[in-house]
Structure formats: structure tokens, C-alpha cells
């Protein structure tokens, strides 16, 4: 069996560790000899900004933005016509599949004209006679 060519996750993990380790070496340092020689005025940018104004809590009722679901999400279906063929078991389409349904066979000869009745033509009863 041929071995599949799949991407090695160990290679991905090693590459990720090396990339992160290289990125840690290139951390931005402010201009100067070391990081500890920052002036006291550098922090004033953040301390002089005023805090955001406090808002009063919203206690009123919120409007409902969801549309209500229609309880009738299905339409009634038309009754189906099952065509019954000779020597074939009749299995209704909407049977309970958990119940062991025993299919039964329709008789040969009485199949067609009893379930699909036709009009019998009477001789001499044409509408063209006068």
C-alpha cells in the first residue's frame, strides 16, 4: 500500500516555535541605552487623558426585534396515488419503519379494473342519434 503524502504537524510546530523565538529577539526598545531610562514625562500621555464619562444604566424595556415564527410551517399535501403492479408487494410510503410491516400481495387478475374503474360503452347510445 502506497504511503500517503501528508503534511507533518511536527514540522509545523517546530517552524512555529522557531518563528516565535526569532520574533522575541526583535522586540522594539525605545531609543536610549536601556529600557529603564525612560523619563517621568513619558507616562503623562496616558495619565492626562480623562476617563470616559459614566453612562446611566439602561433600564427601559428593549423592543423585540425578532419576528415571530409562523406555527404552520408546512402545507397539507395532496393524497398520493400508489400505482400497484402485479406480483409486487404493496408498501405504503408513510408506514412506521420501526414496526415490522409485512407487505402483502395484490391479486393478479382483479388489479386494474377494480381499482381504476372505466365506463363501459353501451351500443347504440351515441349522442349523435336523433
UniProtKB/Swiss-Prot annotation:
InterPro entries: ODAPH
BP GO terms, sorted: positive regulation of biomineral tissue development; positive regulation of enamel mineralization
Entry GO terms, CC: extracellular region
Signal peptide boundaries: 1-23
Keywords for this protein: Amelogenesis imperfecta, Secreted, Signal
Main location: secreted
Disorder association: Amelogenesis imperfecta, hypomaturation type, 2A4: A defect of enamel formation. The disorder involves both primary and secondary dentitions. The teeth have a shiny agar jelly appearance and the enamel is softer than normal. Brown pigment is present in middle layers of enamel.
The protein's name: Odontogenesis associated phosphoprotein
Taxonomic placement: Eukaryota, Metazoa, Chordata, Craniata, Vertebrata
Amino acid at each position: 500500500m502506497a504511503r500517503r503524502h501528508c503534511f507533518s504537524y511536527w514540522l509545523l510546530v517546530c517552524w512555529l516555535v522557531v518563528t516565535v523565538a526569532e520574533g522575541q529577539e526583535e522586540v522594539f526598545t525605545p531609543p536610549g541605552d536601556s529600557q529603564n531610562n525612560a523619563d517621568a514625562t513619558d507616562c503623562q500621555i496616558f495619565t492626562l487623558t480623562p476617563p470616559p464619562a459614566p453612562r446611566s444604566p439602561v433600564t427601559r424595556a428593549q423592543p423585540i426585534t425578532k419576528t415571530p415564527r409562523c406555527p404552520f410551517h408546512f402545507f397539507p399535501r395532496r393524497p398520493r396515488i400508489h400505482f400497484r403492479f402485479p406480483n409486487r408487494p404493496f408498501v405504503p410510503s408513510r408506514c412506521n419503519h420501526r414496526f415490522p410491516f409485512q407487505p402483502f400481495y395484490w391479486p393478479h387478475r382483479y388489479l386494474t379494473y377494480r381499482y381504476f374503474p372505466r365506463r363501459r360503452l353501451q351500443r347504440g347510445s351515441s349522442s349523435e342519434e336523433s
